[in-house]
Each structure stands twice: as C-alpha cells, then as structure tokens.
C-alpha cells in the first residue's frame, strides 16, 4: 500500500531527472560532425607541421608517402589551416572537373597579395566577376593561338642568339641552366614589354628576388591570427622594398608605351607589332570592361607579373629537366636528334610548322612534364561546402593537388621512375586535363587551367629542337653520371645547374 501511494511521485521525479539529464547531455555533448578525410595524427597548436621537419625531404614526396598510408584524399592540419591533399587522378578530377565551381578559389597568401597588388592578377584572384573578365582578356586577347604565332619572330631571334652563344663556347663546358633561364626571360620580356628602353638586367634580377622572397610556405600564412609573426618574419618589409623598385621600372615602361601609341599609333613590339602592354593599354582606353571594374597601371602590372613570373620559370625548368633526362638516357636523345635532323635537313630557316610536326620531341616533353612538373602542387580553396568520396569538405579548406605524386603513381604509369617517352606515342599532345590526360596535368584543369599553355609550350618546343639540331652534348670531365637531385621547395627544380659540353653538329 505504501508503495502504491508513493509510486506516482517517484515516477514524476524520475521522469524530471531523466529529462533534465538528457537536456544537459545534449548541451555538453558536441554535435555529430561530418567526417573529414583521414589523415595522420596531429599535435596541439602545430597540427601536422612536424611531418615536414626534415632537412632533405621534399614536401611533395612527404605528402606522397603520407597519402600511401592514409589514402588519395587526406586531411592535414597545418598550424591554423585546415588542408586537404589529393594524390590520385580520380580525386583530382572531382576537384578540377566535377566540382570545379566549388573549388574555383585560390588560397590567400600574404606575400602573393603584395606582389599582385592585392590580387589584381588572374593566377591568385578569387573566382568572381573580376577574375572572369581578366581571364577573358588572357584567352581572347593576350594569348590566342594567332597572337602566340605572332611572337614567332621574337622567339626565333632570341633562340638564334642562344645558338650563337653556345657555338662560341667552342667545345668548352657551359652552364646550360643559366643560359636557358636568360633566354626564356628575354623572350618573355620582349613579348610582354616590347622594345622600349628599360633596365632589363636589373629588372629581371628584381623579379628573381621577388619570387625568392615570396615563394614557399610562410609561417604568417599558417598562423594568420598571430600578428607578431607578421613582424618577426620580415618578409613583407622585404617584398615592399623590392616591389617599390619594380614599380618604378614598370610605370616608366607603361608610360613609354602610352606615348608611343599616341605618337605613332603602332605597338612597341617587333616591327611595330603590339606587345602585351600595348594590348592592355588599348583595353584600358577602349572601355571594353564593365564600368564597375577599374583598370589602371596596377592591374596591368599584376597581369604582367603572372606572365613574366609564370612564363619564364615554367619554360626554363622544363627545358632544363628535358635535357637532363636525355643526358641520363642517351638512346632518347639519339632518337629525338634523328627525328629533328631528318625534318630540318637542307632547310636554311626553320619555321613553326616544322617544329609542330616533331612527334617524338613532343613525347619527350610530355614525359618530362610527367616526371618533373614545374609546379609540384596545384592549389585551390573550397568556396562551397561539399563532399568528395563521402568525406566532408568545409568552406575555406585549402586544397593541394599533388601533381608530382600523380605523375609517379605505379597504378597509372608502368615503371613510373623511368624516363620512357614512348609511353606517350599514342596519347594526344594535350595538357588540358581532359579525360585521356587526367593521370597528369601540369598546367591545371577546369576553370583555373593556365591560359598560357600554348605560349609556354611553343618556347619549350623551339628551344629543345634547336639545342638538339645544332649540337651534340656530353657531360664535362668524362662524367658517367648526372646528379638529378631536386631542390628543396614546392617547385620541382634541379638542385644543381646543368653543365654540359656542346659540340657543333654542322
């Protein structure tokens, strides 16, 4: 009886206790979050940065090794930055094709913000109206196939001087790396800035200093909330100082172009043709852009930065590695030389069509870019929350596509570490990341694919064709081996300059 009388009270009290407990637990227990991609264990504060503490290891090799343990889509915590690394063609295709719009942004990098005049360029500007207008300028005005062909005389002239310089070595060892770098810089400068007078050597040295200071991963980008790092690192002060000197030169070059256009109505390029600055000035004056998109000197300089920094470095690095690989694989060099010398035999002057018909040389270039992509990573940033392979990718996540690792993936490339151009003989000469080429796309894919592919490849093709046509090559000091070590950094360059002895074929 006593039990019956107290039962309702006990029931009510128990119910209230349970209800309150559930409410408290709901508040305390974190909401279930969608799963991020798997990844290695993390340390407090620094996350996965300890994975990169190595004197000799290259970052893209470290990420390749981590991906072999954790999968082709991997999450890393880089200080305060949440990052995802894609290491397979399948994952890369989703990011650059299937979900291209969701990943159309580029990560914010403080050094790049400075050198591009607050992201007024195309390579690092966020996806939006301004970016679309600038890309349209590149694709429809600056680097159309017709425009690239119009630069032939400048390329021909500069490479002719290169051949003369190498001939003058008279069988002595030359630093081919420096010669090629200087040559590609000269081509880019003539195409972009024309023949107006300016301090060319000083300008290119400043560009080199700027790229060195701005390159690599900076602590300020990994710990953006720690303002003290901005002061202690000192990079920004150095960049502003260098950029101030570059500004003076470029402003003078742009003013010279304006005056020449007004005075003569002609461009400042080869034989009165328009160069890049001339075209950009006409766009500025022609009112072709929407009225809400300002376009002045800083916009022009930012676009020039993309062309000068991207064009010369990409081409020279590719040529350097192609010659290195052919020295390591003499049978490849012999086969390429045979093709070129048969095609050019008896010709006093080489034209662009002659170069375009060199199929084996193109296979050599494809194989070089597979093993040695000039940029080891493609960088993106998630602008819309989405899922990849069942994993959640939050807005703002930095994305790194490991192109270097993709090119050496044994699942897609038999004998991946071997230099075998023949593997590309039945694969179209295509670097757009299309279906048949997704196992490697060194120039990107989708909306943010490099708009200067045809221009860069034209420089690489002509340079290699002339080097292999005019000269036989050997290593200095009867060396039997060539050091192929890569430089530490995010770009896959040679660590040591390539020194070779040329002998005139003719």
UniProtKB/Swiss-Prot annotation:
The stretches that face the Cytoplasmic side, renumbered to this chain, are 26-506
Enumerate the GO terms in the molecular function aspect: heme binding; iron ion binding; monooxygenase activity; oxidoreductase activity, acting on paired donors, with incorporation or reduction of molecular oxygen
Q: Which UniProt keywords apply?
A: Alkaloid metabolism, Endoplasmic reticulum, Heme, Iron, Membrane, Metal-binding, Monooxygenase, Oxidoreductase, Transmembrane, Transmembrane helix
Q: Which GO terms describe its cellular component?
A: endoplasmic reticulum membrane
Q: CDD domains, per this entry?
A: CYP71-like
For the ligand (heme), the binding residues are 450
Q: Which residues lie on this side of the membrane: Lumenal?
A: 1-4
Q: Under which EC number(s) is this enzyme classified? A: 1.14.14.-
- Name the reaction it catalyses: (+)-vincadifformine + reduced [NADPH--hemoprotein reductase] + O2 = (+)-minovincinine + oxidized [NADPH--hemoprotein reductase] + H2O + H(+)
From the UniProt record, give the pathway where this protein acts: Alkaloid biosynthesis
In its keyword annotation, does this UniProt entry include Magnesium? no
Write down the InterPro entries for this protein, in alphabetical order: CYP450_71D, Cyt_P450, Cyt_P450_CS, Cyt_P450_E_grp-I, Cyt_P450_sf
Cofactor needs = heme
Q: Where are the transmembrane segments?
A: 5-25
Q: Which domain of life is it from?
A: Eukaryota
What would changing residue 376 to P do, according to UniProt? Normal (+)-vincadifformine 19-hydroxylase activity. Normal (+)-vincadifformine 19-hydroxylase activity
Q: Where in the cell is it found?
A: Endoplasmic reticulum membrane
* Listed name of the protein: (+)-vincadifformine 19-hydroxylase
């Amino acid at each position: 009886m006593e039990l019956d009388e107290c039962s309702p009270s006990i029931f009510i009290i128990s119910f209230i206790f349970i209800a309150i407990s559930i409410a408290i637990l709901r508040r305390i227990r974190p909401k279930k979050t969608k799963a991020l991609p798997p990844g290695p264990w993390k340390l407090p504060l620094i996350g996965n940065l300890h994975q990169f503490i190595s004197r000799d290891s290259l970052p893209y090799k470290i990420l390749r090794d981590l991906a072999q343990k954790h999968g082709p889509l991997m999450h890393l915590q880089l200080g305060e930055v949440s990052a995802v690394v894609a290491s397979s063609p399948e994952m890369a295709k989703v990011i650059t094709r299937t979900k291209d719009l969701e990943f159309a942004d580029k990560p914010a990098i403080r050094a790049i913000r400075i050198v591009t005049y607050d992201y007024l360029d195309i390579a690092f500007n966020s996806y939006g109206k301004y970016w679309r207008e600038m890309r349209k300028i590149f694709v429809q005005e600056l680097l159309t196939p017709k425009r690239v062909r119009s630069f032939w005389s400048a390329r021909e002239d500069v490479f002719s001087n290169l051949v003369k310089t190498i001939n003058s070595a008279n069988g002595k060892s030359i630093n081919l790396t420096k010669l090629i770098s200087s040559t590609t810089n000269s081509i880019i400068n003539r195409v972009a800035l024309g023949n107006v007078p300016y301090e060319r050597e000083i300008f290119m040295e400043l560009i080199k200093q700027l790229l060195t200071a701005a390159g690599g991963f900076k602590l300020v980008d990994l710990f953006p909330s720690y303002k003290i790092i901005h002061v202690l690192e000192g990079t920004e002060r150095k960049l502003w100082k260098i950029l101030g000197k570059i500004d003076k030169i470029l402003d003078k070059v742009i003013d010279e172009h304006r005056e020449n256009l007004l005075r003569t109505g002609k461009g400042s390029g080869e034989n009165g043709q328009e160069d890049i600055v001339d075209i950009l000035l006409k766009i500025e004056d022609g009112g072709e852009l929407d009225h809400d998109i300002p376009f002045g000197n800083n916009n022009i300089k930012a676009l020039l930065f993309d062309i000068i920094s991207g064009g010369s470095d990409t081409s020279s690095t590719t040529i350097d590695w192609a010659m290195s690989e052919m020295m390591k694989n003499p049978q490849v060099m012999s086969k390429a030389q045979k093709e070129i010398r048969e095609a050019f035999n008896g010709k006093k002057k080489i034209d662009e069509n002659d170069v375009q018909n060199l199929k084996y040389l193109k296979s050599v270039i494809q194989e070089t870019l597979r093993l040695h992509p000039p940029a080891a990573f493609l960088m993106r940033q998630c602008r819309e929350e989405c899922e990849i392979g069942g994993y959640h990718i939050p807005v703002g996540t930095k994305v790194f596509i490991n192109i270097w690792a993709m090119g050496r993936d044994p699942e897609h490339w038999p004998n991946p570490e071997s230099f075998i151009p023949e593997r590309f003989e039945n694969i179209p000469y295509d670097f757009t990341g299309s279906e048949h080429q997704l196992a490697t796309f060194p120039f990107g894919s989708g909306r943010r694919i490099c708009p200067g592919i045809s221009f860069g490849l034209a420089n690489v093709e002509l340079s290699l064709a002339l080097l292999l046509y005019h000269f036989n090559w050997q290593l200095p000091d009867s060396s039997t081996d060539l050091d192929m070590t890569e430089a530490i950094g995010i770009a896959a360059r040679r660590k040591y300059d390539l020194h070779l002895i040329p002998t005139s074929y003719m």
